[in-house]
């Protein structure tokens, strides 16, 4: 069983991340996004894609990498996100078509964006936080969010019932939800978790 966390203000978080019973406090959203190397696309005289449908164009054949949805939770997030937006049948048909343009499928969610930085692909369906990390290190990348939204999975913090009044537990949780989470979110995660983020 989980304890109610009554010493952290849940109103600091955006509504869709709040737990109705305050037994869960959000930490972040691990999201995926379409990440491009604008310089590589420009070299090839290609526009930056503006939609998932754009990725099906012949001109992007062999320029796209994504995590394998059967091996990577990030790849599965992309599949599930489009299944939620369009319905399962349409999403599966889309990925069958997209397969013709895929250079390679990777086993992990950050590999496509790392390959984009290395110049191995121009378009990566990959982890947003890794792209932000690489941009912070100087990589020339653009992060795109299409109208269907970004695939994501939330992460959070809970306390096991019976431990919520222990001072070390309170201290750790209070510390985490001080400036630590604000610094973490502003440095690595553009997805909104907190109201004032």
List the predicted regions and their residue ranges.
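Ligand-binding "clamshell"
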Residues: 1-3, 18-22, 133-145
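Extracytoplasmic ligand-binding site segments that recognize negatively charged/polar headgroups
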Residues: 1-117
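An extracytoplasmic/periplasmic, membrane-proximal ligand-sensing/linker region
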Residues: 88-90, 194-197
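Periplasmic-binding protein-like
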Residues: 62-70, 94-99, 105-106, 137-161, 175-196
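A bilobed periplasmic-binding-protein/Venus flytrap-type ligand-binding module shared by bacterial periplasmic
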Residues: 35-40, 153-168, 184-187
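A ligand-binding cleft/hinge motif common to bilobed small-molecule-binding domains
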Residues: 117, 122-140
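Non-transmembrane alpha-helical segments in soluble domains
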Residues: 53-56, 83, 95, 113, ...
């Amino acid at each position: 069983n989980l304890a109610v966390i009554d010493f952290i203000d849940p109103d600091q978080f955006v509504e869709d991340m709040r737990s109705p019973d305050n037994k869960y406090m959000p930490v972040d959203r691990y999201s995926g996004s379409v990440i491009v190397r604008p310089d590589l696309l420009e070299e090839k005289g290609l526009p930056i894609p503006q939609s998932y449908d754009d990725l099906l164009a012949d001109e992007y054949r062999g320029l796209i990498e994504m995590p394998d949805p059967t091996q990577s939770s990030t790849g599965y997030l992309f599949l599930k996100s489009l299944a939620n937006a369009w319905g399962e049948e349409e999403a599966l048909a889309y990925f069958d078509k997209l397969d013709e343009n895929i250079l390679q499928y990777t086993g992990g969610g950050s590999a496509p964006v790392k390959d984009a930085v290395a110049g191995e692909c121009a378009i990566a369906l990959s982890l947003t936080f890794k792209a932000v990390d690489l941009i912070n290190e100087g990589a020339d990348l653009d992060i795109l969010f299409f109208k269907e939204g970004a695939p994501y999975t939330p992460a959070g913090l809970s306390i096991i019932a019976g431990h919520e009044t222990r001072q070390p537990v309170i201290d750790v949780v209070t510390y985490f939800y001080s400036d630590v989470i604000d610094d973490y979110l502003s440095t690595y995660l553009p997805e909104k978790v907190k109201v004032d983020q």
